[in-house]
Structures are given as C-alpha cells and as structure tokens.
Amino acid sequence: MASGNSLRVQQQADFARTLCHLILWAQQQGMTITLGEVERPPILAELYASMRKGIKDSQHLDRLAADLRLYLSGVYQEDTPAYARLGEQWKKLDKRARWGGDFPKPDGNHFEFIDEERV
C-alpha cells in the first residue's frame, strides 16, 4: 500500500471514529440518527454536479463525508436549522470537521472532514 493510500485510510478511520462520537453524543441528547449517503461513486458525483445537487469533488468520493438523518419525536428533520446543534458539536470534535450548514448553499445534514492541508 502506498503512503498516500495509508494516509487516506487513516483519515477515513479518523472520520468514522469521530462520526461515531457525534452519533453517540446525539443519542445522549435524545436525538435519533440514521445514516444517509457516505460513499459516492464518481459517476454519481458528476450527475449530481450536472443537476446542481452536489459538486464533482465531494468528500463523499473519499468516504470523508456522511449525510445523517435526524429524527426528533419520530419525525425526520429536513431543514438545516434542525441540525444546528449537531453541526456545532461536530466542529468541536476535530479541527478537520466541517458542517454543511455553514456552506454558502446550506446542507444541514452533511458532515465532512477536509484535507489536513486545508485546515
């Protein structure tokens, strides 16, 4: 395995562990969380970009992003503000953590790691 691949695997492991911490924290707060999309194939990223529903270089391509599904009192939350507590907690967990609710076009259920060079 090349060193670049080893680094990517370590980043993916760090992301997965940090995501677990967020989900456990959310459960302690009385939230119900399920997983949405984590890995996105390149062809799907290109399709989403052409439809203006995503970007071609999404962190999902490297398994460094997850779309979470938040349920409060059994009701799925679709609006970004419902995810604000999760987003704030996520950003506290790791310097690489970025929340989609902070994007110019907010994507509240999106949680990702950015490359360490960009931190």
Model-derived features: positions:
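Secreted/periplasmic proteins that engage bacterial cell-wall peptidoglycan
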Residues: 11, 17-56
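Generic alpha-helical secondary structure signal
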Residues: 13, 17, 81-84
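Second-shell loop/turn segments in exported
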Residues: 4-13, 72-79
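Catalytic cores and adjacent binding grooves of peptidoglycan-active enzymes
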Residues: 55-119
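Intrinsically disordered, low-complexity
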Residues: 1-6, 24
